[in-house]
Amino acid sequence: MRGVLIAAMVALVVSLLGTPWVIRFFRRQGYGQEIREDGPSSHLTKRGTPTMGGTVIIVATLVGYFLAHLVTGIGFTASGLLVLLVMTGLGIVGFLDDYIKIRKQRSLGLTARMKFTGQAAVALAFGLLAVRFKNHAGLLPGSTYISIVRDTSLTVGIIGFPLLAWIIIAATSNAVNLTDGLDGLAAGTSAMVFGAYVVISFWQFGNLCEPGDSPAGCYAVRDPLDVALVAAAAMGACFGFLWWNASPAKIFMGDTGSLALGGAFASIAIVSRTELLLVVLGGLFVIETLSVMIQVAFFKATKKRVFNMAPIHHHFELAEWPETTVIIRFWIVSGLAVAFGLGLFYAEFLSHGNG
């Protein structure tokens, strides 16, 4: 528990104190956000706001994680390092996307094919590595079985697992990217989901199956304490960044942050065996993504729009909701989704006769 607290506090402090320095540096370099002309007119005033703030979130998470290990003397684990690999790898893809936007002064960076290739490379590397590195109990970071709150009997096989990992990682990172359209929305929502994974992973650690000792409801997962440590560091980093990203934002996380956060969620869900539970915990990300899918499909079929604009947070902006109202209400939705997801997780544990 001490390591989890250290990781969260160190990441919070690094992010909180490091972000102003990054804001000043990016302003001097002219690293400002380009704004879509077809978006809400109120967003045009945000043009030039420093972006690529996700670099702070990633660095703060890494510092929190590694310093917590240094202080506690706990060894590094395959699961924790793989989550950080995905987070950092997708952060690099997002950084390249943001950098191209800034250099070419346009709202679009990498081509869809280039971004797809980058996401696929990171996800497939994770998928191949996650089915290696058995521990003393014979457990791997990843599992070929599809999981809800723990592994089910449905398996995709050793060949299908990298593909499954790619789908989950790509879908989640793109979902967070779509949500990152209002000041503080993605950062605040991400902090909640990471907080949920601190609880889930630490609970798994306290109820871990051990060789020769597998009480009812125990969890056959590898390295849950280290996963909790990563989630705590990421949560602290998000909260520290949110201080400066809250409306009116002094800096945006950019694709650097949104892709990295999505990758972290997906990889944590995979190593904690909660792949489908992530759909509930990240309910707001799902709603935002579905709004885009519905809008595109309906427009192609009828040439009409369901929403004023997608993702759905822009629909409410164009319906003349103040931006802060949209953000706070969406945070409430996210909080309810996280609470419901944690309730499902605990209810499943109780169903094994642990009540």
UniProtKB/Swiss-Prot annotation:
Cofactor: Mg(2+)
Compartment(s) of residence: Cell membrane
CDD domains with a match to the protein in the record: GT_MraY (cd06852)
Gene Ontology biological process terms from the UniProt entry: cell division; cell wall organization; peptidoglycan biosynthetic process; regulation of cell shape
Broad class of the protein's primary localization: membrane
Family that this chain belongs to: Belongs to the glycosyltransferase 4 family. MraY subfamily.
Annotated HAMAP family: MraY
UniProt protein name: Phospho-N-acetylmuramoyl-pentapeptide-transferase
Species, as recorded: Frankia alni (strain DSM 45986 / CECT 9034 / ACN14a)
